[in-house]
């Protein structure tokens, strides 16, 4: 199940109001949400249009949820930049995994010689 963090549209005509939600990527825009993370009111005064729980956003990003382009922009505009923190954590984990894989490959290659041909005779 691939998860998306995206906007769920509410409000009336010419008065949009959005909820920032975690949904299965196959759900329709206004479909069932797994969790509501916050709100986005594009018509509200500057500085009050976005409010969401950064800790829960980071929780879902660490578990592989992909933000939509608009939600990515909103997350980056918030202080603390949740996306940068998650990306640096992922890079740190990936580099440690690569180091472990490299050490394993080196230990295996030193332990056993590679056979030259299946029958033991050269072709």
From Swiss-Prot:
GO terms under biological process: translation
GO molecular function: structural constituent of ribosome
Pfam families: Ribosomal_S16
Domain of life (superkingdom): Bacteria
Swiss-Prot/TrEMBL keywords: Ribonucleoprotein, Ribosomal protein
One Gene Ontology term, aspect cellular component: small ribosomal subunit
InterPro entries: Ribosomal_bS16, Ribosomal_bS16_dom_sf
Stated family: Belongs to the bacterial ribosomal protein bS16 family.
PANTHER family given in the database record: 30S RIBOSOMAL PROTEIN S16, SMALL RIBOSOMAL SUBUNIT PROTEIN BS16M
Name of the protein: Small ribosomal subunit protein bS16
Gene: rpsP
């Amino acid at each position: 199940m691939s998860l998306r963090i995206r906007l769920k549209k509410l409000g009336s005509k010419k008065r949009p109001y959005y909820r920032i939600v975690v949904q299965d990527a196959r759900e329709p825009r206004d479909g069932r949400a797994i969790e509501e993370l916050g709100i986005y009111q594009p018509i509200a005064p500057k500085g009050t249009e976005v409010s969401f729980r950064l800790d829960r956003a980071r929780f879902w990003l660490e578990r592989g949820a992909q933000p939509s382009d608009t939600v990515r922009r909103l997350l980056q505009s918030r202080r603390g930049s949740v996306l940068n923190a998650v990306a640096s954590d992922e890079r740190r984990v990936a580099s440690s995994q690569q180091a472990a894989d490299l050490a394993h490959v080196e230990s295996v290659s030193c332990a056993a010689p590679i056979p030259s041909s299946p029958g033991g005779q050269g072709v």
